[in-house]
Curated annotation (Swiss-Prot):
Species for this entry: Sinorhizobium fredii (strain NBRC 101917 / NGR234)
Protein name listed in UniProt: Ubiquinone biosynthesis O-methyltransferase
GO BP terms in the entry: methylation
Gene3D superfamilies with a match to the protein in the record: Vaccinia Virus protein VP39 (3.40.50.150)
Statement: the UniProt record of this protein carries the keyword Glycosyltransferase: no
Reactions listed under catalytic activity: a 3-demethylubiquinol + S-adenosyl-L-methionine = a ubiquinol + S-adenosyl-L-homocysteine + H(+); a 3-(all-trans-polyprenyl)benzene-1,2-diol + S-adenosyl-L-methionine = a 2-methoxy-6-(all-trans-polyprenyl)phenol + S-adenosyl-L-homocysteine + H(+)
Gene: ubiG
Length: 248
């Protein structure tokens, strides 16, 4: 297959999330797990960015002046907080419906985000570049993980960072993140995740490193039902996050 013919888009996944687009900002709706997940991933991103760029994480706008891409942004659950932290945010999603919801919510919230219904490969072909690229809960929904990671890596500026969050392909993840979350607890609609599309850390790190990126941190993330919140963990068997930087 030629490079120009490759695509990161799985249309069935785009259609699935488009059908739920109206619920993005409902903290009790189909995206409730992401609302719960937001505090821990926002803090993680902020702290790692501040560490890399020499910023004060306690500053009201620690990301001020940094250009950030939120790829697969959905309704903007990450894009808006990143913009509030001062980043110049481009929120990209393959779903026109998701982008419509994101634009409407941002307008009502007074947050400035450049939302575009566009693919990662289209942005890369246009020569876009960023200090920070977020791939959060996206890779398990794309058609070609290697191509997606390589494409996104090419948009990271020297000294910049890429964050990836996803679900590991393990039996433990199948039991907890798919069977329990979708069929028992009903946190997610059935069919949200398919086991064969889950991605192991090394399957993300290989194309990143081949693209000149250096993996600088890995962490697991787990849900504590007693505290009703997500926390960082050494256990990467289910949910995990990776940070990679492009050397100067």
């Amino acid at each position: 297959m030629s490079e120009t013919a490759r695509t990161t888009i799985d249309q069935s996944e785009v259609d699935r999330f488009s059908a739920m687009a109206a619920e993005w900002w409902d903290p009790t709706g189909k995206f409730r797990p992401l609302h719960k997940f937001n505090p821990v991933r926002l803090a993680y991103i902020r702290d790692k960015v501040c560490e890399q760029f020499g910023r004060d994480p306690k500053s009201p706008q620690p990301l001020k002046g940094l250009r950030l891409l939120d790829i697969g942004c959905g309704g903007g659950l990450l894009s808006e907080p990143m913009a509030r932290m001062g980043a110049d945010v481009l929120g990209a999603d393959a779903s026109e419906k998701n982008i419509g919801i994101a634009r409407t919510h941002a307008a009502g919230s007074g947050v400035n985000v450049d939302y575009r219904a566009v693919t990662a490969e289209a942005l890369a072909e246009a020569g876009e570049s960023f200090d920070i690229v977020l791939n959060m809960e996206v890779v398990e929904h794309v058609a070609d993980v290697d191509f997606f990671m390589t494409t996104c890596a090419h948009m990271v500026r020297p000294g910049g960072l890429m964050f990836v969050a996803t679900i590991n392909r393990t039996l433990k993840a199948a039991a907890l993140a798919i069977f329990a979350a979708e069929n028992v607890l009903r946190w997610l609609p059935r069919g949200t995740h398919q086991y064969e599309k889950l991605v192991r850390p090394e399957e993300l790190e290989k194309p990143l490193e081949a693209s000149g990126m250096q993996v600088t941190d890995r962490t697991g993330v787990f849900f504590n039902p007693l505290a009703n919140q997500w926390n960082l963990s050494k256990d990467m068997d289910v949910n995990y996050m990776i940070v990679a930087k492009r050397p100067l």
